[in-house]
Protein backbone atom coordinates (compact mmCIF):
# COMPACT_ATOMS: atom_id res chain seq x y z
CA UNK A 1 0.00 0.00 0.00
CA UNK A 2 1.13 3.50 -0.82
CA UNK A 3 -0.10 6.21 1.57
CA UNK A 4 0.36 9.96 1.66
CA UNK A 5 1.24 11.50 5.00
CA UNK A 6 0.03 15.06 5.42
CA UNK A 7 1.44 16.98 2.43
CA UNK A 8 3.91 14.23 1.46
CA UNK A 9 3.21 11.46 -1.03
CA UNK A 10 5.77 8.80 -1.98
CA UNK A 11 7.55 9.51 -5.28
CA UNK A 12 8.27 6.15 -6.88
CA UNK A 13 10.03 5.85 -10.25
CA UNK A 14 7.82 4.00 -12.76
CA UNK A 15 10.50 1.32 -13.33
CA UNK A 16 10.72 0.41 -9.62
CA UNK A 17 9.11 -2.82 -8.41
CA UNK A 18 6.98 -2.47 -5.28
CA UNK A 19 5.58 -5.76 -3.90
CA UNK A 20 1.83 -5.68 -3.45
CA UNK A 21 2.06 -6.09 0.33
CA UNK A 22 4.84 -3.54 0.91
CA UNK A 23 3.84 -0.38 2.79
CA UNK A 24 5.29 3.01 1.82
CA UNK A 25 4.12 6.25 3.35
CA UNK A 26 5.05 9.92 3.42
CA UNK A 27 8.19 11.68 2.22
CA UNK A 28 9.82 8.78 0.37
CA UNK A 29 11.62 8.87 -2.99
CA UNK A 30 12.50 5.59 -4.73
CA UNK A 31 14.79 5.57 -7.79
CA UNK A 32 14.69 3.70 -11.06
CA UNK A 33 14.88 -0.10 -11.20
CA UNK A 34 14.87 -0.33 -7.41
CA UNK A 35 12.93 -3.17 -5.82
CA UNK A 36 10.93 -3.12 -2.60
CA UNK A 37 10.11 -6.70 -1.67
CA UNK A 38 7.36 -8.47 0.24
CA UNK A 39 6.25 -7.08 3.62
CA UNK A 40 8.74 -4.20 3.59
CA UNK A 41 7.69 -1.08 5.53
CA UNK A 42 9.12 2.32 4.55
CA UNK A 43 7.81 5.21 6.64
CA UNK A 44 8.58 8.77 5.68
CA UNK A 45 6.25 10.28 8.28
CA UNK A 46 8.96 11.79 10.53
CA UNK A 47 11.73 12.81 8.10
CA UNK A 48 12.60 12.09 4.45
CA UNK A 49 13.70 8.72 3.11
CA UNK A 50 15.73 8.78 -0.11
CA UNK A 51 16.39 5.55 -1.98
CA UNK A 52 18.62 5.63 -5.07
CA UNK A 53 18.60 3.67 -8.31
CA UNK A 54 18.87 -0.13 -8.47
CA UNK A 55 18.57 -0.49 -4.69
CA UNK A 56 16.98 -3.69 -3.42
CA UNK A 57 15.24 -3.76 -0.06
CA UNK A 58 14.44 -7.35 0.75
CA UNK A 59 11.53 -8.99 2.52
CA UNK A 60 10.42 -7.86 6.00
CA UNK A 61 12.80 -4.89 6.25
CA UNK A 62 11.71 -1.76 8.13
CA UNK A 63 12.93 1.77 7.33
CA UNK A 64 12.18 4.80 9.52
CA UNK A 65 13.77 7.98 10.88
CA UNK A 66 14.12 10.29 13.83
CA UNK A 67 12.95 13.93 13.50
CA UNK A 68 15.09 15.98 11.11
CA UNK A 69 17.34 13.00 10.29
CA UNK A 70 17.00 11.78 6.70
CA UNK A 71 17.45 8.10 5.89
CA UNK A 72 19.60 7.87 2.74
CA UNK A 73 20.34 4.79 0.63
CA UNK A 74 22.54 5.51 -2.38
CA UNK A 75 22.54 3.73 -5.75
CA UNK A 76 23.16 0.00 -6.07
CA UNK A 77 22.89 -0.82 -2.36
CA UNK A 78 21.52 -4.14 -1.12
CA UNK A 79 19.42 -4.24 2.05
CA UNK A 80 19.00 -7.88 3.13
CA UNK A 81 15.97 -9.62 4.59
CA UNK A 82 14.53 -8.29 7.86
CA UNK A 83 16.92 -5.34 8.20
CA UNK A 84 16.05 -2.30 10.32
CA UNK A 85 17.42 1.04 9.11
CA UNK A 86 16.81 4.14 11.23
CA UNK A 87 18.07 7.56 10.08
CA UNK A 88 21.28 6.05 8.68
CA UNK A 89 23.33 6.66 5.54
CA UNK A 90 24.02 3.68 3.29
CA UNK A 91 26.54 4.58 0.59
CA UNK A 92 26.70 3.33 -2.99
CA UNK A 93 27.24 -0.42 -3.55
CA UNK A 94 27.04 -1.27 0.18
CA UNK A 95 25.41 -4.51 1.35
CA UNK A 96 23.57 -4.83 4.66
CA UNK A 97 23.27 -8.49 5.70
CA UNK A 98 19.96 -9.97 6.76
CA UNK A 99 18.70 -9.26 10.26
CA UNK A 100 21.05 -6.31 10.79
CA UNK A 101 20.12 -3.09 12.59
CA UNK A 102 21.67 0.22 11.50
CA UNK A 103 20.87 3.10 13.87
CA UNK A 104 20.68 6.91 13.77
CA UNK A 105 23.65 8.71 12.29
CA UNK A 106 25.53 5.53 11.36
CA UNK A 107 27.19 5.63 7.95
CA UNK A 108 28.01 2.55 5.93
CA UNK A 109 30.79 3.42 3.48
CA UNK A 110 30.75 2.88 -0.26
CA UNK A 111 31.03 -0.81 -1.11
CA UNK A 112 31.10 -1.89 2.56
CA UNK A 113 29.55 -5.17 3.71
CA UNK A 114 27.71 -5.50 7.03
CA UNK A 115 27.50 -9.16 8.10
CA UNK A 116 24.17 -10.78 8.92
CA UNK A 117 22.72 -10.03 12.34
CA UNK A 118 24.97 -7.06 13.04
CA UNK A 119 24.13 -3.98 15.10
CA UNK A 120 25.70 -0.74 13.91
CA UNK A 121 25.25 1.73 16.80
CA UNK A 122 24.35 5.40 16.45
CA UNK A 123 27.04 7.52 14.81
CA UNK A 124 29.31 4.58 13.90
CA UNK A 125 31.13 4.98 10.57
CA UNK A 126 32.08 1.86 8.63
CA UNK A 127 34.84 2.67 6.12
CA UNK A 128 34.39 2.07 2.39
CA UNK A 129 35.21 -1.39 1.07
CA UNK A 130 35.37 -3.15 4.44
CA UNK A 131 33.57 -6.04 6.12
CA UNK A 132 32.06 -5.33 9.54
CA UNK A 133 29.94 -7.52 11.75
CA UNK A 134 28.96 -8.19 15.33
CA UNK A 135 26.88 -6.62 18.11
CA UNK A 136 28.17 -3.96 18.13
CA UNK A 137 29.63 -4.15 14.63
CA UNK A 138 33.39 -4.03 14.36
CA UNK A 139 35.46 -3.65 11.20
CA UNK A 140 37.00 -7.05 10.46
CA UNK A 141 38.97 -6.64 7.22
CA UNK A 142 39.04 -5.10 3.76
CA UNK A 143 36.79 -6.84 1.25
CA UNK A 144 38.36 -9.31 -1.14
CA UNK A 145 37.81 -9.35 -4.88
CA UNK A 146 35.62 -12.42 -4.34
CA UNK A 147 33.49 -10.49 -1.81
CA UNK A 148 32.99 -7.65 -4.29
CA UNK A 149 32.03 -10.09 -7.07
CA UNK A 150 29.45 -11.75 -4.81
CA UNK A 151 27.98 -8.37 -3.90
CA UNK A 152 27.76 -7.41 -7.60
CA UNK A 153 26.10 -10.73 -8.44
CA UNK A 154 23.46 -10.19 -5.73
CA UNK A 155 22.77 -6.63 -6.94
CA UNK A 156 22.41 -7.78 -10.55
CA UNK A 157 20.12 -10.67 -9.62
CA UNK A 158 17.81 -8.38 -7.66
CA UNK A 159 17.59 -5.83 -10.48
CA UNK A 160 16.67 -8.68 -12.85
CA UNK A 161 14.15 -10.23 -10.43
CA UNK A 162 12.61 -6.85 -9.69
CA UNK A 163 12.09 -6.13 -13.37
CA UNK A 164 10.57 -9.59 -13.86
CA UNK A 165 8.07 -9.02 -11.03
CA UNK A 166 7.36 -5.51 -12.33
CA UNK A 167 6.47 -7.08 -15.69
CA UNK A 168 4.13 -9.54 -13.96
CA UNK A 169 2.34 -6.68 -12.20
CA UNK A 170 1.67 -5.03 -15.54
CA UNK A 171 0.19 -8.10 -17.24
Swiss-Prot record:
Organism superkingdom: Bacteria
Keyword field contains Transferase: yes
Gene3D superfamilies assigned: Hexapeptide repeat proteins
Signal peptide: none
A matching Pfam family: Hexapep
Protein family membership: Belongs to the transferase hexapeptide repeat family.
Name of the protein described by the UniProt record: Uncharacterized transferase YtoA
Species per Swiss-Prot/TrEMBL record: Bacillus subtilis (strain 168)
Gene from which this protein is expressed: ytoA
Amino acid sequence: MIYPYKEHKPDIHPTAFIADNATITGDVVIGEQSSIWFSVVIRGDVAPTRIGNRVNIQDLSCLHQSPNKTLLIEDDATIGHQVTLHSAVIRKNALIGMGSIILDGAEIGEGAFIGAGSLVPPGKIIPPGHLAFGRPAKVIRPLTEEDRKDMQRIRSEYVEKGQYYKFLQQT
